């Protein structure tokens, strides 16, 4: 009898709810009655049929009118409250056409006769009691992106909207500033396809957005609509852990009160399940299936497949066989050609012929759970065909590698320290200086992490990592970094393998020496006797003749074999490169991008697993991978003389870290997760990712190599020397333009800069580990790089950047370093480049960059702070030692004996060294006069810089007094002017630091350079 009583109790509330519902329905009907009829609105339109023959109903209905490219769509009747994906692609008219350009999670919400497109708040949630949920909902509201009018109510009861007005008129809202419809009158409906789970719509537009040359460019923009699936499909999210690198889906749960519980992070991964859970090794219920687009060259497809298949081995370790399946589109047979690469139901590997070295593996992720729903891989051919090294583009990037936001802020106010300015062509220097000064005023000094635009992927270093709940691979530079290595290979394949040739010559000489020694021993053991000696001499003569004939025959055989080998090699070239060389490089790159689609982030510590000798050894070659992961930017392993054999040029499989990461992300044994993570201290499982590359850890770097990078850097410099010796006679062939000599030299200068920049990161460095308390070994999370390693790195930078001989310049080479004079854009900036190479500007650009690496405030602060991290009785590289070492290297001529026979053609201090010295002096002045209080280290830095300047003036005085009469005019004038500027600057500096208002007077006294 109690139930009816309760029913009576709640009857008034129920009646009120029903009444409200009826009133809402009536109001909706009234609004619908005010709208035009659907028949009138859809007049002249034809419905787009569902493309799937096995289904009769699409995600929503679409009608098109071909004559004027009009498109209308009817949303589902039950659209309210549902989340939808809108995935974006610029599918033509762009160098990165086909690259997934980001996505939006949206809701439609009706307001009278208009529909608002809403970006729901997904970042802040409450999973606890009803009160906390209500509070969060009230405080953290959704965002209105745009609104459109309702044209009519459709035949299925849903609102009808103007799709072309939405997608063309608001293109910038979706794609960001890179897409702006500059002429709305010129557009065309490219395609409209309706599927059961998605709708695909593409328009040709005139784009006048950012980075578009001229008033407009025809492009195709593609929209993919799909419903965000429910969370009731059996997928179980997995917590992220900073010791293993996965992209994450993150939100704040404000119903929790512990710090560790408030921020919820799930790894992004696929929903893989065993078909038969009883089997230790079972096929998946639904594999990850990739389709290779028909545009991928047939000659490369087996290597694409190899890169994908690498990962199946890792999934077998967790009990899934054939977790990833690969299929091929084929235009000739029509196989899979009905599948649209933009269709979100299919995962595609796409190939772009855009002459740009890049690759990317973005994915679409459930915003609540981190489940990966679909993914694509875009490969380009530019890195393979890359032969034209662009000095102005790549050199500054190499020089800026590892710079932090702190350093960028400093460079913005000190442009003479900025490698991007110093390496710029003279005609662009002022523009670059102003540009970077503006960037320095932005958050984090214009650091890419702060400026990444989530609306469009592929144009910023940290794309995909910020701006949305779920991270994804928004930009990958693995292929771009490999472009420089391939450019070396394309200098001349014979040059690339010259190290093997040199090793072969050395081995031949060693064998000959051994044979000579054996012959001497044999002669000594002969019996005495004139007759026997005569017989032996005659026999030896005959033998010598026979040997000469044999040598001639052997030489001919070797020549024939070389010719046969060359012919055989030519038969297996892929676009001018041996298949055995470039094929594994492509497989390595594909494996890297597949790793991203599986949820894995970069691991920039992976290349530091083995020493260079271990990598180039028979024990490792073909048996183990050269790095612990394919998720690093590992350079091509060009050997000169390290180890006992040329090791693998690239990764030949996924590495031990990759197996471990897949085990953590995809194992079915949740109880094993802590045990899996506890292995994080093992050498092959070390991890650092994108945001770590600007920190103090020298092993967390892109493009470095080996456990002992100093050995790698020295090896690179040997290759540089070898290449430079062969530029004129080997690289530039008969009939070639002499512009190749310049390009060849600038390639070597790029490699030299890369090696020096890599080693500069070790100065002031500290190894950083992601261990947690209780992990094996009890390592401290921060461990200062041993002082001896820092000193060795410092010496390498000095030797490779400060001295003339490091650059290998000769009059014969310089007079042939011309330029190709074409105005058609065939070579970058060639029409504006002088035929005479700007020797001093180019070399000073590298020298100035080296000084910036070693003397920028961030590096000096790290050295200063490291002194306190170590016990006083432990060896450390100190700030005074660093500055004194640089000073001694830059001004070494002052300590030498007075020169004999010097004149203006043979100066005591060369022109390149005078430039370096003037630059160094100015850097010390900048540090002395710096008044910023950004860091507590500025004062001791300033004091020590002042002391170095005082020491320098004393050394200059002593040198002028001792050797002044024997100095050439260049050197004497240089030293005299340097001393005068230091004295005046230090005197003015006291006034400047006492009252900054005196700065104009200081500038007047010091001249333009002091600004």
Question: Can you annotate each of these PLM segments?
Answer:
Residues 28-32:
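Sec/Tat signal peptide C-region and signal peptidase I cleavage site
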Residues 261, 294, 298-306, 580-585, ...:
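Soluble non-cytosolic domains of exported or imported proteins
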Residues 317, 327-355, 584-591, 596-640:
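The catalytic-center signature of Zn2+-dependent metalloproteases
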Residues 457, 461-467, 471-475, 483, ...:
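Conserved catalytic/binding loops enriched for acidic/polar residues
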